[in-house]
Amino acid sequence: KDIDFVFGVGGDDKKNSSSWILTEWKTPKIDRVWGYYRDLHSDGPGVKVKELTVNPNSKLSMQMHDHRSEHWHVSYGTATVNTAIDNPEQYSTIKLTKDNTINIPVGTWHQLCNNTDDELRVVEIQHGENCIEEDIIRHGVDPYYGK
């Protein structure tokens, strides 16, 4: 009748959560130099939904896509977005805060930056003939990435 519990449930002894384990199993993190992303949904080759988490004071490369457009929705933090039509060195910059959105058409140069000391989270909806990671053209050699 004298039973000692060795494993705690919650409280100070809680080491993990089943909801965290389930999230990692369903949508594993894909680590990148700028943070990470999770694939949230894919509806065939033409639609993909991701959540991007950009580390403080980090940025993605200046890039464009031949086969997909993107729609970004800031869910947390402040984003600085650089876009250009023809010449990626002649870009315009806008700031987006929580619940702001931007559409990035096919063939538009774009760069997502987090110039703050807080995490940035963006929901990205890709739409096009083929939403694959290989559909990316980076501008020049980015010293941040070394490629």
Model-derived segments and spans:
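Classical nucleotidyltransferase
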Residues: 1-32
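A short, N-terminal "cap"/entry segment at the start of jelly-roll beta-barrel domains
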Residues: 23-62, 93-98, 136-147
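Structural motif
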Residues: 59, 71, 78-80, 101, ...
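Short hydrophobic/aromatic-rich beta-strand segments that constitute the beta-sheet cores
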Residues: 61-62, 81-83, 124
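Glycine- and acidic-residue-biased ligand/ion/polar-headgroup-sensing regions
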Residues: 66-87
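Short acidic-glycine-tyrosine-enriched beta hairpin
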Residues: 83-109
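Double-stranded beta-helix
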Residues: 111-147
